[in-house]
Amino acid sequence: STCKMDIICQPIGTYTEEGFKRGVKNMPLPCEEAFSVNADLLKTIFEDNDVFNFQIGYLAQNNNIKAMVDGDKLFSKHIAVVGSTGAGKSCVVAKLLQEAVGFDNGLNKNKEHQKNSHIIIFDIHSEYTNAFKLVESEKFNLNLLNIDNLKLPYWLMNSEELEDMFIESNDQNSYNQVSQFKSAVIKNKIVKNNNSNVNYDTPVEFDIKEVKNYLENLNRERVDKKDKRTPILDDGTEVEDRYEKYFSQIFEFKQSDTNNGPYSGDFTRFVTRLETRLSDERLKFLLSPKKEDGTSFHSNDFQDILKQFIGYIDDNKSNITIIDLSGIPFEVLSTTISLISRIVFDFAFNYSKLKHISGETNDIPIMLVCEEAHNYIPKSNESQYKSSKKSIERIAKEGRKYGLSLMVVSQRPSEVSETIMAQCNNFIALRLTNTNDQSYVKNLLPDNIGSICEALPSLNPGEALIVGDATLLPSVVQFKMPNPRPKSETINFLSKWEENWREITFEKVIKKWRKETTT
């Protein structure tokens, strides 16, 4: 007896003497013969194409055939890398970036001539440092920024970031708080920079402690009982200009023959919040950062602050900048990411505009890698993520025009901002076990890739479905392990539990917890 099988096929391209092209002009007739593609033809389709010049791995069904993509389209258009915990996301990201900057099995192919790649990684769990540290003889300079050496003075924040940091949006006096805080910041910027042409968002120096003094004086203020306007200090001095007087120190006010000032008692919680923030040792990197010589940052240090993010650190040019956010307190994570993202975008925007004047395009394109993206650019509209979402969504919508692309990495793609995911042109999907995430990713992908998506929950570690503008065909690819590897190994609980009892130096843990210096 003859065994009959029904095979459901999806036409995806046409192969002729001129080679393979995506898309089908003339559909085959029902009675025409069908053949399976042999290995030689697959090799021709995937490897014999000059446009597809960047290897990302090997075809999962035949590991003798290289999986090639268009490198320009891969990195110049936003990429989403998604997959459940343990599927191999960190290794895939590390391998892609190692190939992009010229790593070859732990060696630096470009050590004789520095190349022009600029990649910034938001590293939430301190995983990627290991993946980009080579021996000194390979001459690869990794630019590692963390809470101890990050130069990020608070006066670079814009209005939204400042208010996220210092003002409770649900406080009944939040309107007055914003109004007076804004006025004080602008006035202090004018004083500190001797320039009246500044606004709330101008990235120039101001003194947050002086702003706090101003607000506390408003909160204490007593005014003349007769005119009900003029503040009177305890020594009888009449205050003619609040800004000129109140920045310098906190004053006592005359109690007799005076009334409460217009904001008396209204800012008590606000001032307490400011004091709490300013005294928090964990926030020193942001609220009281110091240069190497121990002095504070000023407006004319802006160039050095900017250069750290794109790899221009003194003479140590760096293709990879890792921003290790593992030590950043969660309550300011969104603000920190927003500030850095916005600085990088504004640089790319203004550099591109300068190039456009002379008819050129941006010649130092930058990729921003958002690891664990669901933690700070979520789909939800919670106020604590407002600033980071706004900054990165702007990059997603406008960045490519100015030479700034995104790589969005997440184990929960269904929880990432839809605005950002919808702007991704290339998808690398590793094993996904959550049905919501599977459905979400399927809805983002083209309709014509058919049942290949059904493989998502059963992919092996390091295997990924590759779809997008950079690929010749939707394919399941096996990525090779990066060398060196990121530090993302799972702790072996049972093995550790079976070891002998370990003592803990609790003092060191607590010092680290409090961000004190450990010895």
Where do the PLM segments sit?
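Conserved AAA+ ATPase small/helical "lid" subdomain
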Residues: 176-200, 454-485
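Basic- and hydrophobic-enriched, low-structure N-terminal and domain-boundary segments
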Residues: 1-83, 91-92, 96, 105-106, ...
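Glycine-rich phosphate-binding loop of nucleotide-binding enzymes
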Residues: 55-145, 418, 466, 497-498
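Short loop/turn elements that form and flank the Walker-type P-loop nucleotide-binding site
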Residues: 75-76, 114-116, 316-317, 361-364, ...
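Hydrophobic residues in beta-strands of the RecA-like P-loop NTPase core, especially within AAA+ ATPase
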Residues: 122, 370, 409-410
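Conserved ATP-driven motor cores of ASCE-family P-loop NTPases powering translocation/secretion/packaging/pilus
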Residues: 168, 393-478
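Conserved P-loop NTPase motor module
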Residues: 461-519
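P-loop NTPase motor domains
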Residues: 126-130, 155-391
